[in-house]
Each structure stands twice: as C-alpha cells, then as structure tokens.
A protein has these predicted regions:
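Short, conserved beta-strand element in jelly-roll/cupin
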Residues: 72-76, 86-103, 141-144
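A short glycine-rich, His/Asp/Glu-containing loop-to-beta-strand
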Residues: 44-85, 90, 169-172
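Double-stranded beta-helix
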Residues: 2-41, 46, 130-172
C-alpha cells in the first residue's frame, strides 16, 4: 500500500527509502521529517571513523535533515582499541546487538556491554574502547547526526586501563 507514496529519492541499491506523507489517521508528522525504512536484506554500508568497522547507514540522517543518525556498527575480530577520544555531539546511544565491547571512562569506571545492554554517553565525555576480539555488532544513535570525534591524550597520564576489570565499576 505504501509503494505509491515512496519518496522519489529511493536508494534502490541499499533498501533504504523514505515515505513523504504516509497519510495515516492524523498525519501530523513533524515538519521536515519523514518515515524511513531500511531493509535488512539490502544493507547500505558507508565509510566511517574507524577503518576496522563496517557502518550500516539506516537512513535516519536524511529523514531527519541531520538532526539524528542511526547506524549499525559491525566490528569483526580484526579490530583494535580506539585510543582516548571524545565526540562532539549532544549524545551518543549504544545498544549491543551481538558480541561485546568494553568501554572505559577512567581506571575505575570500565563497562562491558554485551548483547541486550545499552549505554548513553553525553557529548564531550572522554572514553576509550578496548578491541573486541570476539567481534561486536552495535546500534549507535547520535544527536545530531554529525558527530565529530577528537583524539585526546590519556587523561590519567601513564596509568593504563586494565580492561579485565570490566563490569567492576566503582561508584563515587
């Protein structure tokens, strides 16, 4: 039923398409926003900030005019630590679909996300991700879509993170 209302800028090769006016019961969509559908049988991968990660674009950036981005990140077994960094954005939300990833905010604040776990990181929060030797698949949402990444020096000087302590976050 929706095929007559599909936005003309359909990405035929990617399975991503937007619906201009779904004409549902009330049709009070926020101006400038569109319904977007990303078909799993035709994923659209784009370049991203890490060479060892495949970024599946879900079409949200275009549908929200850059106000939000949603991507599925696939990091295989040949991945590495990100180094200390921060993101220039309002927030970054992670939902672990498969595998696991370990993220540290300090030597005492180390979190391991496994399938079904989620985390919201406010923009500007310094952190480091360990490599995920078993691989990981994550849904990442950022507001806004344009999320700058800046490398920063180790805020703890010569202190190295012991990622084996993941999950033992010390509350202060």
């Amino acid at each position: 039923l929706l095929t007559n209302r599909v936005h003309p800028t359909r990405h035929a090769d990617s399975g991503i398409f937007t619906i201009e006016k779904p004409n549902v019961a009330t049709d009070n969509a926020t101006p400038g926003k569109r319904v977007v559908v990303s078909k799993g049988n035709a994923p659209h991968f784009i370049p991203g900030r890490r060479s060892w990660v495949r970024y599946r674009e879900l079409g949200v950036t275009e549908a929200t005019n850059g106000e939000m981005r949603a991507q599925v990140l696939h990091a295989g077994t040949a991945n590495e630590s990100t180094g200390w960094h921060l993101h220039r954005c309002d927030m970054q939300f992670l939902y672990c679909i498969d595998g696991a990833i370990t993220i540290a905010f300090s030597p005492d604040h180390i979190v391991r996300l496994e399938a079904g776990d989620s985390m919201m990181i406010p923009g500007g929060t310094i952190h480091i991700e360990a490599g995920a030797p078993e691989g990981v698949e994550i849904l990442e949402i950022s507001i806004p879509a344009d999320m700058g990444t800046e490398s920063v020096p180790n805020p703890y000087g010569d202190v190295q993170i012991d990622f084996s302590k993941a999950g033992t976050v010390t509350a202060r």
